[in-house]
Structures are given as structure tokens and as C-alpha cells.
Amino acid sequence: MLNRTLAFSLPILALLAAGTARAETVSVFCAPTEYDLCIKAASAWKDKTGNEAKINKMPQLLDDAIPLYQQLLAAKSTDVDVLFLDVIWLGMFKANLLDLSTLIPKADQDAHFPSTLAAAKLDDKLVAMPAYMDVGLMFYRKDLLEKYGKPVPKTWAELTVTAKEIQDKERADGKPDIWGYAWQAKSYEGLTCDAIELVSSNGGGNIIADDGKVTIDIPAAVEAITMAKGWIGTISPEGVLNYDEEASRAVFESGNAVFHRNWPYVWGTSHATGSAVIDKVGMMPLPVGKAGEKSSGCLGPMYYGVSKFSSKPEVAASFVDFVTGSDMQKMRAVDAAFNPSIPALYTDADVLKKIPFLKDNQQAFSDSAVRPSGYTGTSYNRVSQAFYRTVHDMLSGDAEVAPGLKDLAAKLEKLKESR
């Protein structure tokens, strides 16, 4: 009997030992503001697969991770498996990221917004999977639009007229500090986002097309930037030329702007203690430049990708599939109000309770505009810098729009080839 028991038990022990041997550990980079969420996701993945994810906290300023990534990838280090990536880094690191197209189930890929997934498809490879997304949105004083009987504007021209009318009437009513529109016109990456939104929604593309064609020196772009230049000093203060997200948000949340372009996080901050506009805020996709064009909020999602030098590519890809999947995206939305990149979650009751505006703004995520980081790759930062500096000069009156865009196009033709 003992012999029979041993004979029966040995194969089971062997299977258990084999199962233990198959357990793997992958090294994962995570944003510092999301560390607790990453730990929670790693725990859930271990419960499901038996594998472990070692979570490494990235620098507080995410851009400081770029030289760290460059060093690790240049050394072909196997110390890191999974990288946390900004959308504009994908082109920069695409040569060192694993193609996930055959490692992530097609159904899981298709669950995401097409534009979000498309931003990670470079050189016919899927170099990363979306973790969550941001997109430029328009916030507005719904109480003031109701007060003056104004509909939500559908075009930038309508916004311009409505902003000026309400601004002037509110000033006449004893509110001298109010402006029609607060946005980001400082000379920095945020202006690249704002300007691309204007140009793209006017049918002008996104500076450089996916095939490498420079598209900025065209009438649609001239028209869009000229319109924005006209806002300075009329519906936007001169100080907007130094506004980033936080400076413009402060103006809106103090009650001194009718319209405000920013990222989805402003929904939460505008309803927080200290805001002067609690329960007075509406939100909508950005207007279009011309009828028939798409609202083109700048796409700002974050991704997870796998290092090409990982010694455990299949396991690392499995973690990426898990952490970017529906369950973990719902967890991030409910726990911390992160915006999912999976459309199905936009009708989820638990998610909508936490982020109620999602049900009204799904189209903004679907129609978003992509910065040209895919084609430009490692030269993206130089391309963006040339763009936002040129646009800032135009807005401030230091350069004419049409000649400035022509000169910019010539400069971009050279910069794009140094990718």
C-alpha cells in the first residue's frame, strides 16, 4: 500500500515542482504617482498566474526616466522587462521595444480605442499597449451659458463669439477680471498640444504625417493659428502666453474664465474644496474648425511596453496584457479616476460613479489627434520644440503666421530625417 501511495504521489509532486519552477519574476517600471496601483496590479497578477512583478518606482519627473531608459537599453540590459511609456516616447524607443502584435491576443488589442492603439503601431509593429489615456477637453461655465441663453459651441468660431459676448456682459455686471478663454500658450510641450488641436480640427493634419510628409505649411494651419493669435488680448489675457496647465486652471477655477481647455483631471479639481466653480462646470469635446471636421483633442495616453532585451519576453508580455486589460483599467478608474482606454468601461456603472463625465466624452477619446512622435522617433523633441517656439512667436506678434509656417516647414524637413 505504501509503495502504491508513493507511486501515485511522485507524479503529483513532480507536477507541483514543475509548477513552482515555471513561476517567473519580471521587473516593471511604474510612475511614482501610481506606485500603489502598480503594487495592487502586481498582486492581482500573482494571484492569477503565480508569477511576480517587481515594481520599480520611476523618477518623480517622468522625463528624467528617459536617460535611464536610454542607458539600460543601450547596454541591452536584462535587468528590466516592462517599461512605462509616455505616448511621445514610443517613437524614441521603438527600436528597443518588443513587437507585441503576436503576443497580445487580438481581442485584447481591439478592446482599446482605435486611435490609442494606432499610436503604438510603428513600422508595422505593436510596440506597447495603452494603460490609460488623456485627451484635450473643453471645460466651460454652464451657469453662464444658461444665464445668457447660449448653446454649447460646436466650432471655434462659435466659441470665440460666445466667449467675447459673455466676457463683456459679465464685466459690465461688475466682474472686471473675467476672460472668455483660458488655455496654454506658453512656449513648451503644452503649446504643441493646443496648436495641433487647432490645426487638426481645421483639417490641417498633425505637423508631420505618418508617411513623413510635412503638413504644417498649408492654408488650414495658417487659418487656425491666425484665429488663435486673434484671441490674445480679446478673449484671452496677454498673460496666456505664459500659461501652462496649472496657471490656466487657476484662472478658470477662480471663476475668471468662461471656457478652459485642459486635460480630464480638471473635472476633479474644479469640484474640489477651494474651487469657485463647484457645480458650475460643464465639459465637452473640443470644438472643430470647420463643419464636417472631427474634434481633435490631443492624445496623451500612457503605455506599457516590453524591452527587446528581456530574458522573459512572453511572461513580460503576459503582464502587459494583464495590467492594460479591462479589470486593471477599471481598478485604476474606480480607485484613482484614471481614464480608461477601453470603450466598454465607459458604460460601466462603477466607473461612471467615479468619473461621471466619461459617458458624455467618449467621442473625444475616439477622435483624438496624435502628435507626430511615431514617425519622428528620437527627433520628436526637436520637432516639437521648433513647432511650439514658432507658434509662440506668432501668437506674441514676433512673427507673421504664413511666412513663419513656411520657414518652419523647411526646418522640419531637415529635423525629421535625423530620427
Enumerate the language-model features and the residues they cover:
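Short, well-ordered beta-strand elements
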Residues: 24-33, 51-58, 81-82, 127, ...
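C-terminal lobe and pocket-closing loops
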Residues: 265-278, 289-389, 417-419
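Glycine-centered hinge/linker elements that transmit conformational signals in sensory
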Residues: 163, 210-241, 286
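A structural signal for short loop-to-beta-strand junctions that line the ligand-binding cleft
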Residues: 71, 79-81, 108-144, 179-180, ...
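Extracytoplasmic "Venus flytrap"/periplasmic binding protein-like
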Residues: 44-112, 119-121, 143-154, 251, ...
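Extracytoplasmic/periplasmic solute-binding protein
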Residues: 127-131, 136, 160-213, 257
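Hinge/lid segment of periplasmic solute-binding proteins
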Residues: 86-135, 176-179, 191-194, 278-284, ...
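Short, polar/charged alpha-helical segment
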Residues: 33-54, 387
